[in-house]
């Protein structure tokens, strides 16, 4: 039987990230053959990963990496936020994101076949991480953005990597691109322009907003406040010429009823029309970045800010860890009872 030296154990640990006892056991099992020991640990890791496959991994980090005219963004999940601050986990996120930016895979299957810096495939790296870290570790998603030489990337991560953003801007400097990435991190838009919002989505969001108004009106009724009206429209897509013309006529009728002199109507109507548009584009303001008030200067929208700069937002990606994942609700008392059996 081959002698298992401390140097052999150290080398195997460096190659696989395994613990001391696991590395020593692997070498004993394969009589000191380093390559076989690596494969032994990988097989063992795949078995561990399979056992953890059904677990919910909703914590983790985003990764952002810019490589010349290519930028990558990733979301890597773990089961607990404790693990997401682990040095090995952070290193895996950064290296996987860099590998994806350089390899430009077309889909997840292609991404998993990319070779990491140590020669291991990206997919195997996550299997190995699951085995060595002890939690389900998974690359949930990634996106790539490319730009031309005269465009700028903005890259930003917020709250220690819980949110990651990439922007692509035309006609802007790097600082503007980053500031817009910061805005997107904070305001969580879904699309660039209201034109991209689906009609059914607008209708659904109007229903959500009107439900909130109903809840507010219940509170207002308790203090004898006038109820707020329901929103009829939510997007500029819905504000046709006929809708705007009717709104203008309604404003004129209101001014007439109030006894305002007709000669001053032209000074009043534009402001009231803008208020009508603002009130009836709430879905745009929540979900379309160009319609949102710019967080660096809320006196203007992002669209107005970019127009002043002579810039155009070409694309963006925003990832937030765990969004859309239904997290398991832990019952601590039940867990303790189970352990006491």
Curated annotation (Swiss-Prot):
Pfam families according to UniProt: EF_TS
Tagged with keyword Manganese: no
Family, similarity comment: Belongs to the EF-Ts family.
Species annotation: Lactobacillus johnsonii (strain CNCM I-12250 / La1 / NCC 533)
Entry annotated with the keyword Transport: no
Chain intervals for the UniProt region annotation (Involved in Mg(2+) ion dislocation from EF-Tu): 80-83
Protein name (Swiss-Prot/TrEMBL): Elongation factor Ts
Keywords: Cytoplasm, Elongation factor, Protein biosynthesis
Protein function: Associates with the EF-Tu.GDP complex and induces the exchange of GDP to GTP. It remains bound to the aminoacyl-tRNA.EF-Tu.GTP complex up to the GTP hydrolysis stage on the ribosome.
GO MF annotation list: translation elongation factor activity
CDD domains linked: UBA_EF-Ts
Protein's cellular compartments: Cytoplasm
Annotated Gene Ontology cellular component terms: cytoplasm
